[in-house]
Structures are given as C-alpha cells and as structure tokens.
C-alpha cells in the first residue's frame, strides 16, 4: 500500500543500469526500452520527470516559477572513465547535486499544483488528456442531466469511430512525423543570412480549421467506385496501399517518401532515409500523402489496393473548445504577474494536444 516515489530525469537512460539492482513488480513502458514508471517488489516507484515536463534539465530550470536555479555547465568532464570507486571532486559533486535540485524544485511545484505527489500525472500528455476528457464528458452546468446527456452523445460518437485491430495497424502504417529533411545540396554546410517562418501554435490551429475522419473506415470496391472521384471529394478521406513503379524525384530537395515506410522495394536510391528514386515500392498512405507524392515525384505507374474511405467532419465541439481555452490562457496569461504557473501549464498542455491524439495503444 505504501509507495516511495522517486523521480528520475530521463528514466529510460538510467534504467538500463539500475534495473540490475532491483527486483521489479511491474514496469510501464511507452516503447521498447522506454519505461516511464517502474515499481520494485518492496514499493519503490520510479517515475520519469523528463516525460512529465517535456523539458531538458536546463529548460526545466528556466521554467521554474517559485524557485530560482540554473543548470551548471562545463563542470563535469564526460570523457573521463569512471567506476564505482572513483572519487568525485567537490566541483563535480556540486554539478551532480545541482541537477538533483532542479528536479526536486520542479516536483515541489507540481505537488503544490496538484496537492499531493500521488495526483501528479505520469506524462504531460496525461494532463491534457484528462482536461479534454472532462470537457467531452461533463457539462459546465451543475445539472446532472446535462452531463449525462453530453457523456452519452460523446460515447456514442466514439463507438461510431472505433476501429478493428487490422484497421488500426493500417492507420499506424500511414502515420508519419513532420517533414524536417535537409536538402542534400546544403546538408553539412553552414549557410549565412537565412530566413524562416514560425507558425504560432500550428498543430492546434490545424486541429481547429481542418476536417478529420469521423466514421469507421469503409472498405471501397474500386470496381464500383471511382478512386479519382473519391480523391476529389472533400467530404471523404482515404487510406490505402499504393504500389509505385518508376519513381523519380522532380527535384533534389523535396524527397517526401520515407524509406522506412516503404516495403517490397526495388532499385532504391535513398537521400538520407528518403526515397529519391526507386524502380518499385509499396507504401500505405492517405489521400493527402498521395497528392504530395504526385507533386514531388514523376511516377510511371500507380496501383491502388486495400482502399478504405472515411467520412470527414470537424472534430467534436468539446475538443475544439478545450483547444481554444488552452490557447486563450496561453496568450492572455503571458507576462501577467502572479499567473506564471497557469501560463506555463496552459502552454505545455496546448503543445501536447496533438500528441494526445496520436498516442499509440
């Protein structure tokens, strides 16, 4: 029943060493070798403060509200070989102690916010998930019938959007991260006088402005339905397996297809993990990907199979309202004296809204 909770900044790194010295009751990991919680048989619970905060130690120190501390730099030589018998100097011990104090101060602020260490969520995404869940399932009014009705409507909607295991696996094959690939013409070189554009809260903005699949996937019989017509229908979204033959990039700096997302490949010339040219490949994509691929590549032949369609609609109103509330708090509380905690919380939660939607199960 009793637990001793210990926070470790980047638990997945430290765990590979410390796992040998404890007997474990249970370990919760988000990926292979990425535990975020580990409990020993005698009740010691290790949690990951890096996953909770989303910040490096240096950035974490900068974002503390009621504590003033900075991460020390340059006082620890990582090139030296050390073992369990190595004595650390006062300067080195000070460096190590400072890192621990940053995490300690952060957790103290979290306890103040949540009232109890056991109430602190495991991840930053967990905070926003609970916030959005409450918006979707409960009414702001004190009337019980309002909350019951809202809860039932949202539950019914989620049932309408549920997936089979095969459909979920296929959607995972479609999923890609952001396109941040460097041009092979300039990779490794230092460029002067460059320009850039930053879209403020770009991911949440797109979640508000665009339509998303709001139905179960429906298998398409391409003998009866025109793929081209479906592709041009803004009320329909598609996912499908796509075989491409004779693939050639139209230019040298926009290689969209990721080599790791392709299978049954032949004659691939890769540009740092991206397909520059291929005799043949198969991949699983959406209609959005397909339009981008057509814009980036010259392709001799395209064969579409295993096609599913979704009916597109804007995200449920409670989710949109939750995003808008977080954005409002982020913008109106910035720089307001006495609202530092609320500002940083809203900023962190807003940045985690997209991550909440693409968390693997």
Predicted regions and their residues:
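Conserved acidic
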Residues: 2-10, 15-361
């Amino acid at each position: 029943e009793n637990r001793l909770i210990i926070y470790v900044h980047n638990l997945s790194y430290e765990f590979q060493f410390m796992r040998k010295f404890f007997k474990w009751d249970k370990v919760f990991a988000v990926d292979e070798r990425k535990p975020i919680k580990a409990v020993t048989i005698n009740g010691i619970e290790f949690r990951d403060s890096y996953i909770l905060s989303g910040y490096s130690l240096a950035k974490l120190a900068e974002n503390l509200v009621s504590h003033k501390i900075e991460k020390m730099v340059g006082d620890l030589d990582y090139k030296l070989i050390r073992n369990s018998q190595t004595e650390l100097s006062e300067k080195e011990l000070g460096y190590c102690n400072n890192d621990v104090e940053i995490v300690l101060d952060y957790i103290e602020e979290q306890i103040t916010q949540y009232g109890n260490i056991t109430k602190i969520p495991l991840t930053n995404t967990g905070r926003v998930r609970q916030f959005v869940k409450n918006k979707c399932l409960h009414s702001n009014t004190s009337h019980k019938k309002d909350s019951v009705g809202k809860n039932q409507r949202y539950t019914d909607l989620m049932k309408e959007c549920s997936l089979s295991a095969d459909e979920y696996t296929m959607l995972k094959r479609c999923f890609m991260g952001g396109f941040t690939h460097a041009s092979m013409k300039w990779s490794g070189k230092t460029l002067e006088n460059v320009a850039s554009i930053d879209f403020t809260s770009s991911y949440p903005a797109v979640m508000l402005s665009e339509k998303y699949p709001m139905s179960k996937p429906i298998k398409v019989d391409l003998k009866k339905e025109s793929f081209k017509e479906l592709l041009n229908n803004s009320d329909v979204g598609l996912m499908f397996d796509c075989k491409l033959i004779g693939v050639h990039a139209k230019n040298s700096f926009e290689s969209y297809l990721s080599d790791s997302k392709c299978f049954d490949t032949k004659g691939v010339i890769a540009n740092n993990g991206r397909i520059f040219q291929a005799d043949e490949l198969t991949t699983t994509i959406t209609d959005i990907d397909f339009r981008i691929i057509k814009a980036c590549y010259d392709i001799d032949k395209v064969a579409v199979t295993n096609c599913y369609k979704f009916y597109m609609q804007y995200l449920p109103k409670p989710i949109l309202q939750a995003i808008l509330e977080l954005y409002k708090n982020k913008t109106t509380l910035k720089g307001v004296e006495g609202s530092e905690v609320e500002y940083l919380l809203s900023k962190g939660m807003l940045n985690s809204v997209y991550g909440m939607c693409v968390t693997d199960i």
